[in-house]
């Protein structure tokens, strides 16, 4: 004769299934803290310690960095601008301060370069562009895409490093045409653009490191999906009180 499972066992099994569902919905990108927040948002009251223990028992582990991902070597900077934000990554409203940076994505077909602009207010990716060539057109296309979507007012601060793409006369002219101010990090100081660096670290941990893209087109498609259908709209950010950029803007703009 089999003993009927206790109430605690039933509750644990139900909670385990809920945890597993959230874990797989976010493709292994959420750890115990964020999964607990998701459960709270759906009315399930539990705590991070219990969620973490159940995840361990089920063999569920959030994606983590396995190796240090190198940026490309930035050369040829010929112009510097003042640092207008001084590591203060705060804004009072959308489209007051944007950050910009580039990185590279390996594929079996060859390297794909990615440029991104982030709005400091909500951490939303307002613009992004990809190319097989690391030229100033890449960062100009990214910035113009962001302007086309967000329509920033004159006075917008755009903070980047001193890479040659950002110091180029064509990029700087593009900023001036929309009334934007150029701000730049000190040479060799990644902390001056820490929020931007944090995004790339997240992108690589949650998508790139496990991807092994065959072609640039495949990488472009997956990065598009990650940014537009996940990062901006669903992914919780601890710095936004565990809201997505979309929800943070909705409740704070």
Curated annotation (Swiss-Prot):
<keyword id="KW-0815">Transposition</keyword>
<dbReference type="InterPro" id="IPR012337">
    <property type="entry name" value="RNaseH-like_sf"/>
</dbReference>
<feature type="domain" description="Integrase catalytic">
    <location>
        <begin position="90"/>
        <end position="253"/>
    </location>
</feature>
<protein>
    <recommendedName>
        <fullName>Transposase for insertion sequence element IS904</fullName>
    </recommendedName>
</protein>
<keyword id="KW-0233">DNA recombination</keyword>
<dbReference type="Pfam" id="PF13333">
    <property type="entry name" value="rve_2"/>
</dbReference>
<dbReference type="Pfam" id="PF13276">
    <property type="entry name" value="HTH_21"/>
</dbReference>
<dbReference type="InterPro" id="IPR001584">
    <property type="entry name" value="Integrase_cat-core"/>
</dbReference>
<dbReference type="GO" id="GO:0006310">
    <property type="term" value="P:DNA recombination"/>
</dbReference>
<dbReference type="GO" id="GO:0032196">
    <property type="term" value="P:transposition"/>
</dbReference>
<keyword id="KW-0238">DNA-binding</keyword>
<comment type="similarity">
    <text>Belongs to the transposase IS3/IS150/IS904 family.</text>
</comment>
<keyword id="KW-0814">Transposable element</keyword>
<dbReference type="GO" id="GO:0003677">
    <property type="term" value="F:DNA binding"/>
</dbReference>
<comment type="function">
    <text>Involved in the transposition of the insertion sequence.</text>
</comment>
<dbReference type="GO" id="GO:0015074">
    <property type="term" value="P:DNA integration"/>
</dbReference>
<dbReference type="InterPro" id="IPR050900">
    <property type="entry name" value="Transposase_IS3/IS150/IS904"/>
</dbReference>
<dbReference type="InterPro" id="IPR025948">
    <property type="entry name" value="HTH-like_dom"/>
</dbReference>
<dbReference type="InterPro" id="IPR036397">
    <property type="entry name" value="RNaseH_sf"/>
</dbReference>
<dbReference type="Pfam" id="PF00665">
    <property type="entry name" value="rve"/>
</dbReference>
<dbReference type="InterPro" id="IPR048020">
    <property type="entry name" value="Transpos_IS3"/>
</dbReference>
């Amino acid at each position: 004769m089999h003993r009927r499972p206790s109430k605690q066992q039933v509750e644990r099994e139900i909670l385990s299934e809920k945890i597993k569902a959230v874990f797989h919905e976010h493709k292994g990108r959420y750890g115990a803290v964020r999964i607990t927040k998701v459960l709270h948002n759906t009315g399930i009251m539990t705590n991070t310690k219990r969620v973490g223990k159940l995840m361990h028992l089920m063999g569920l582990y959030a994606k983590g960095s396995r190796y240090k991902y190198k940026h490309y070597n930035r050369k040829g900077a010929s112009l510097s601008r003042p640092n207008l934000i001084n590591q203060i990554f705060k804004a009072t409203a959308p489209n007051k301060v944007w950050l910009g940076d580039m990185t590279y994505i390996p594929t079996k077909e060859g390297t794909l370069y990615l440029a991104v602009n982030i709005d400091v207010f909500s951490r939303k990716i307002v613009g992004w562009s990809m190319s097989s060539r690391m030229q100033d057109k890449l960062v100009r296309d990214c910035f113009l895409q962001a302007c086309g979507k967000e329509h920033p007012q004159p006075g917008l601060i755009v903070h980047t490093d001193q890479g040659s793409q950002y110091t180029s006369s064509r990029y700087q002219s593009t900023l001036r045409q929309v009334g934007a101010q150029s701000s730049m990090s000190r040479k060799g100081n990644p902390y001056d653009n820490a929020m931007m660096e944090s995004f790339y670290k997240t992108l690589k941990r949650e998508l790139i490191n496990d991807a092994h893209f065959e072609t640039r087109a495949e990488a472009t498609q997956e990065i598009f999906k990650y940014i537009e259908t996940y990062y901006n709209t669903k992914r919780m950010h601890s710095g936004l009180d565990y809201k997505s950029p979309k929800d943070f803007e909705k409740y704070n703009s």
